[in-house]
Amino acid sequence: MASCVGSRTLSKDDVNYKMHFRMINEQQVEDITIDFFYRPHTITLLSFTIVSLMYFAFTRDDSVPEDNIWRGILSVIFFFLIISVLAFPNGPFTRPHPALWRMVFGLSVLYFLFLVFLLFLNFEQVKSLMYWLDPNLRYATREADVMEYAVNCHVITWERIISHFDIFAFGHFWGWAMKALLIRSYGLCWTISITWELTELFFMHLLPNFAECWWDQVILDILLCNGGGIWLGMVVCRFLEMRTYHWASFKDIHTTTGKIKRAVLQFTPASWTYVRWFDPKSSFQRVAGIYLFMIIWQLTELNTFFLKHIFVFQASHPLSWCRILFIGGITAPTVRQYYAYLTDTQCKRVGTQCWVFGVIGFLEAIVCIKFGQDLFSKTQILYVVLWLLCVAFTTFLCLYGMVWYAEHYGHREKTYSECEDGTYSPDISWPHGKGSKGSEDGPHKHPGNSESHSSRRRNRHSKSKVTNGVGKK
């Protein structure tokens, strides 16, 4: 009797909540192609771990202290990634393999712990650590100390404009193409692009390299590099949205060419989500959520410049571009989880990768403030307040413009919940692309296909699904 009283039957809301959170935090693999890659191999990994540790512990030369420390750190990272594959969640993506995204999450946890460790060091210890990683950093200089910015802006010649198309211009272009692939909204991408140029103006008194001529900011940065990258990224998004994916199993492909093509397709998304950051029923919570998204995005970008300015290393140094690539890698699942949290009322909490990304952004800012107190003592509080107000205004203006566009030019359609197949809101409208859209966390179904949707959902329940390498029916 006591056990009956103590037990609690989960309500429908509790079940929906757990299901919705799991869809963005623990995506399951459906339509498994090669069973070997999705079977649990825990005993094999355990044996490999023990044997490899014994081999390196008793056979390598440990007479060089620096090599001992370096190889020990690499071994810790390597085996932590093995634990990540075994224990961490898949996240919202499953292509090319869930193990990859578990390792991405594991690397983000390691970086988070490394930032916590840095907070308990002094500046000399941090610099000694950097010199140990790369002795050439002893002779590094700040770009702002050897270059001039925003000089002779009234002189505009073709030679001067062409000279600005360097490797960094191509970096801007491809960087914004990738950002457009992640955000998938013209309005939000353009808002972030313009807001970043305003951010440079407000923080120009701290970072001299933010000073640019007006034609460099408006024409080269916003219109050509950023705008071209946004256009390319959105074209790719539109192509993926209109494309129908038929993920055939290797067992169903009998030609060598077909098997090779299927292997290449394994490194493309299983499906693509049509993203709607804004809808005509947006509330204050939606505005606040997108405002927070833009603030964290701008903060992450600012950290890139403050870190290399405070700790003195060039933008071309591996410490800079490796961090940029790493942040880009963890941004993909982060944006996906935050979008689901922001747009689906059934998702009551953010995913773990999104949580870790937010902590990393603020920890990097704290590290910059601690070790750059001389720099931040020159901060003009008025500029920071105006920057926050400017971001808030542009967020509201962009949201209002997107809502106005949706109300006047959007097509009224039934829409399904971001994480749930069977629920929709018929009174929300926004512009929709052609064809049926899918997502990494489950295909979006068209309202007219309710019968086929139900049958497909029943069929999916009978297929094998994998979570953290453990297969279950």
From Swiss-Prot:
A single GO CC term for this protein reads:
endoplasmic reticulum membrane
Topology, Cytoplasmic side: 2-35, 94-102, 208-216, 308-319, 377-383
Q: What is its main location?
A: endoplasmic reticulum
Q: Which reaction does it catalyse?
A: a 1,2-diacyl-sn-glycero-3-phosphoethanolamine + L-serine = a 1,2-diacyl-sn-glycero-3-phospho-L-serine + ethanolamine; a 1,2-diacyl-sn-glycero-3-phosphocholine + L-serine = a 1,2-diacyl-sn-glycero-3-phospho-L-serine + choline
Q: Which residues carry this modification: Phosphoserine?
A: S417, S425, S454
Residues with the modification N-acetylalanine, per the entry, are A2
Q: How does it sit in the membrane?
A: Multi-pass membrane protein
Leader sequence range is: none
Bias type Basic residues, positions: 455-464
Mapped to this chain, the residue ranges on the Lumenal side of the membrane are 57-72, 124-186, 238-286, 343-355, 405-473
Subcellular localization: Endoplasmic reticulum membrane
Q: Does the keyword Transferase apply?
A: yes
InterPro entries, sorted = PSS
Protein family membership: Belongs to the phosphatidyl serine synthase family.
Q: Protein name, please? A: Phosphatidylserine synthase 1
